[in-house]
């Protein structure tokens, strides 16, 4: 289960996480003695119609055009005569030209009994058994015979050998003159730098913009919590004013009640009031009327001011019907 070069699937990542919990590390085998497999079993999906043992890389390794050219050249002989040059065909081989690798098994397909396996030879004195070669010898012999049938000259040459033969030249037309792809690579690097300089700052700004709304939402949430926990400052001031006003009104009412009680007592006793006492009583009555008239508009102003700071009602969360 060692890490592969490609991306790991979700199931494989989950399995590795579970094994890491139990002390497994990459490169170790499974089992108590750690002598089991160290790599995951990979499923290979067969998506073609080729048979068992088919080599899909054969189309890249087998140089069929070279094989066909050498095969046709070997079946032709050129002779020089007095009259000129004669071209004779040495072999009467009518095999079709194909891009598939030649094999011995395919050449015996049209035989009458080619599909049967020979086990013994019938003789006058009895049967003579055929010696069956071992599997390794048969595979080696079949492989050697198939290689002999392949007439392409580039089969045993690697890419490095071909490059040496060609003097280090590649398919690039200017490579034979010492030209390389350095100019094109430098242009691509310049384009990448310009792209980063042009759009790199915009991407950073977008990230900052994406972060700032989250910060503002957090601040708004904190302010809402503070407002929910405490009252508005305007309402606090209005409550204090109302309290002071009530205390003042209560004290004035007590004074008025005392004065009325004194007047009633004087009337009962029929004691004549002095001019100063009469003037003071008139002043108090006029103040009382003025206070009653000014009290009503002030109360309206207080109610209007308190309407501006009303606590928002908390929305009740709707319960899901599924619950």
From Swiss-Prot:
Spans annotated as Disordered: 1-32, 84-110, 124-185, 197-323
Domain of life, per lineage: Eukaryota
Bias type Polar residues, positions: 294-306
Molecular-function GO terms, alphabetical: nucleic acid binding
Record field: compositional bias (Basic and acidic residues): 9-32, 84-94
Domain G-patch, chain residue ranges per copy: 11-57
Record's compositionally biased regions (Low complexity): 131-141
Composition bias type Basic residues, residue spans: 281-291, 311-323
Annotated disulfide bonds: none
Start-end of Acidic residues biased regions: 252-261
Listed PANTHER family: G PATCH DOMAIN CONTAINING PROTEIN, G PATCH DOMAIN-CONTAINING PROTEIN 4
Record-given protein name: G patch domain-containing protein 4
Organism: Xenopus tropicalis
